[in-house]
Design a protein with these regions (language model features):
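Short beta-strand segments
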Residues: 17-50, 66-67
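Charged, gly/pro-rich active-site loop segments
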Residues: 78-150
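Surface loops and adjacent helix of pleckstrin homology
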Residues: 50, 69, 148-150
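Helix-adjacent hinge/juxtasegments
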Residues: 54-87
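Beta-strand-connecting loop/turn residues
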Residues: 42-44, 62, 141
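Short, basic/aromatic recognition patches
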Residues: 1-20
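Short, structured patches in soluble enzyme cores that scaffold and shape functional sites
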Residues: 26, 68-70, 139-142
Length: 150
C-alpha cells in the first residue's frame, strides 16, 4: 500500500540522507542530476557544485527540486520531493554554509556508515584544484513524500 508521508516524516527522510537528485530547467528542458546535499532540518538545503551547466541554468531559472529515496526493494521504499528556490551564496555566508554542509555530512556518514571522514573530498568530488566552488542553497517551498510497505 502506498501512503503519503507526513511533513515530519518527509523532513526526516531528507535529513537522514545526503545524496539526492537535483531537478532544474535549462532551455525549456528538464534535467535531473545526482548531487550531494545537506538539509539543515528547518527549511534549507545546502549544496555546492563546480561552475558549469547546472549553475548557469539555475541562475536563469531559480525554481528547482530535490528528490531523495530510500529503496529497500520494490515493496518497501520511501521517497520525498522538495520544491524550492535556488540562491547562490557568497562571502561569509558561503563559507559558513560550506562548513555546515561538510560537518553535517561527515556526521551522517559516521552515524549511518560508521566511517570517520576528515576531508570534503572523501565524500564529494566537486572541488578541483584552483577552482572555486559555487555554494548555494535551496529554500524549500513545499515538501511531499510517499512510501510503500507491503
Amino acid at each position: 500500500m502506498i501512503k503519503n508521508l507526513s511533513q515530519k516524516e518527509s523532513a526526516d527522510l531528507l535529513a537522514n540522507n545526503y545524496i539526492g537528485y537535483l531537478g532544474y530547467i535549462y532551455k525549456d528542458c528538464p534535467f535531473i542530476v545526482p548531487i550531494t546535499y545537506f538539509f539543515d532540518g528547518k527549511n534549507t538545503i545546502i549544496l555546492y557544485s563546480s561552475e558549469g551547466h547546472k549553475t548557469a541554468a539555475m541562475r536563469k531559472n531559480q525554481r528547482v527540486s530535490l528528490q531523495v529515496s530510500e529503496i529497500k526493494n520494490i515493496d518497501n521504499w520511501d521517497s520525498v520531493l522538495a520544491h524550492g528556490v535556488f540562491e547562490e551564496l557568497s562571502g561569509n555566508d558561503a563559507k559558513r554554509s560550506l562548513h555546515e554542509f561538510a560537518t553535517g555530512i561527515k556526521h551522517l556518514i559516521l552515524t549511518k556508515e560508521e566511517k570517520n571522514l576528515h576531508f570534503i573530498g572523501e565524500f564529494s568530488s566537486k572541488i578541483y584544484k584552483d577552482e572555486i566552488p559555487v555554494i548555494f542553497k535551496i529554500t524549500i517551498d513545499e515538501i511531499t513524500g510517499k512510501n510503500r510497505i507491503h
